[in-house]
Amino acid sequence: MSRPAPTPIYTLRGAGGPLNTLHFSCHGGDTPLLYSASGKGAIHIWNLNTRRAERIVEGHSGNSIIWVSTLQAAHTLISQGRDMQVCLWDLSEGRSEVVDSVWTGSVGFCQCSVLETSPGNQLLAFAGQQTEEIKIIELPSKTPVCTLVPDAKVGMVMCIKLWQPDSGPGPLLLAGYEDGSLLLWDVTQRSELSRAKAHPEPVMCLTFDPERLRGISGSSEKTLSSWMLDRQNNLQLQDDVTLVNAGVSQLCIRGDGKLLASAGWDHRVRVFGWKKLKPLAVLQYHTDMVLSVAFSDHQDPRQRLLAAGSKDQRVSLWSIYNEGADTG
């Protein structure tokens, strides 16, 4: 007998706009939170115990917000808007004020990437004013670190991911470009380490597993492309996953490295086993494009959630494959 189709354990409504980005903060503190940011310039901070918005922060002059995250320093929120600004917010003691901002000069949809380098210090990478350039600065000082521009014509930078390898002196950055190329950059040396042509179309999204040195990317086509880094930091293309319908907005790997989720333009979330890319579930709830997916960072694995945000202005939350089920 086949399993019944999964249904959300609950949904969050009232965001008032397409949900471009989601970020969980469930690891520390008393209250598990989910941050969502909309195409109308609002950040909702959802209390997952009450399932209601604890706070709504209006920012970026009503422009679409395309990325939110929290910094390790307590109560600091970081957001990126289509107004070409990255804002740092103080949310401590009930505040909701912008304490600093960074002008990016980019009107594109490339989401920022942030990496903690030491307690209270981060690197922030973002698409720059020129279509192919990536700028990296230190936070909180805003000191410029480098600007990364490819030698070849690869078009606009579409997506980026900073990470710190276990071995090696400094951070690396993965970037997907308009011509379908992936590039690996050495931030310290400001140099390109390797490249691979992963897609015939622009790379819409990518995610990376630093423990396994393995990543996956999506585009407007029906294919997910997986790839890995060898010991010489060369990008090696691996298996492809063929989708039923074209178009992926976002990809996310669960913290334990067992699951991969994709946000589909076909209104569906697809869940795969990350090890072998085995299809596990198709989550159907939304009535428009799914724009964002995120796994929660609960310490207790049984509480882990998958959230999906859609153009239909709703967030769905799912509890799947939490009890040691075979994920392939």
What are these regions (language model features)?
Residues 1-17, 50:
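A short helix->beta-strand "capping" segment at the edge of beta-propeller domains
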Residues 7-9, 52-55, 97-100, 145-146, ...:
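A structural motif specific to WD40 beta-propellers
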Residues 11-41:
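Beta-strand-rich domains and repeat architectures in extracellular enzymes and scaffolds
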Residues 12-19, 58-65, 102-109, 149-157, ...:
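WD40/WD-repeat beta-propeller blade N-cap
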Residues 22-31, 68-74, 113-121, 160-170, ...:
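Loop/turn segments within WD40 beta-propeller blades
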Residues 37-40, 80-83, 127-131, 176-179, ...:
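Conserved strand-to-loop turn within each blade of WD40 beta-propeller repeats
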Residues 43-47, 86-91, 134-138, 182-186, ...:
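WD40-repeat beta-propellers
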Residues 291-328:
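Blade-level signature of beta-propeller repeat domains, shared across WD40, Kelch, NHL, RCC1
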